[in-house]
Structures are given as structure tokens and as C-alpha cells.
Amino acid sequence: SLSTTDHSQIVPMINQLTSTFDDLKVGIPSTRVDSFSVDVANAVAKGKKHTLTLAPEAGSQRLRNAINKLVSEEDLLGAAENAFQRGWTGIKMYFMVGLPTETMDDVDGIIEMGKKVKAIGRKHVGGRARVRVSTSNLVPKPHPPFQWARQDTGDELQPKHLRLREGCRSVGAEFSWND
């Protein structure tokens, strides 16, 4: 899928806009991990480096492969390391819950990812490191590959949300979800 950061001239465009308009703040949507660029992140931050949003989508490599998000855990952790090394203090990670073939092991993978990113943040920015795990429930829409996938019921999603809330809290990550 197309990402804002795929544009070959995104950094020069951001730099030109922010130098032309002093009070302009530029934001980019959640970034695919495979197209993450510290240069883009730094251009957007323009001195203020708070929270960077990445979209790994699923908590396990098995499930990322199943949904064709060919991003490795190593890619994600490398992006987090680069951001924290350059002074960013927060990483928000966006995941989907209720994907076809998802198991509680996949849900636990989200928590584990939060734990690893938090550890990387602490290594580079100490107690200022903030990690937020944000999830949305899969709602099948027309035309994408999962248009005919069965949507998890509220009773199926509730234990996943509870596990994520408790698990994220135990590893020092914030958790939020959208129904």
C-alpha cells in the first residue's frame, strides 16, 4: 500500500514548507515500518521529537506474513532504535485485532513487541521513553483481501483487549483501542 514516506522528495518538501512558514507543523500518518525514514521523522519533528507512529499491524511474523505485511520484528525494532537514538521519546505502534487466523499467541506478540520497544527506549532516553500500543478491531470492507472474512464478535474480542490491557500495563506500555 502507498505510504506518504514513499515519495522520493518528501524530505525536501517538508524542509521547504517548514522553512517558508515558521509556525507550520507537519504531521505524517502512521508509517509503514518498511518505509520508515529517520530523515523524514527528523524533518517533521523540526526540533521537537515526541511520538513517532509505526504500523506493524500484527503481533507475530506468522500473522504479518498472512496479511502480506512483510515487515520483520528486526525492521520494527531497528526503526524504534533509530528513533530513540535520535532523541524521539515516544513510539506509538498500531495493530489490528481480530485478523483471520489470529490466536492468543499473536495477541501476546503485540505485548512482547511493546516490551522490546520500551526496553530500547529506556536504553536511549531513560525514563522519558513512552510506548503506546494502539489497536483497532478488524472490520472487513469491500474489495480488500479480507472482505469476506468473518468479523470477531464482541465476546471474542473482549478477552483479547483484556489481555492486551493487562499485558501492556505489566511491561510499561500504554494501551488504547478503537471498537
List the model feature ranges, each with a label.
Residues S1-R130, S136:
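Conserved SAM/AdoMet-binding glycine-rich loop
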Residues F84, V107-D179:
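Auxiliary Fe-S-binding modules of radical SAM enzymes
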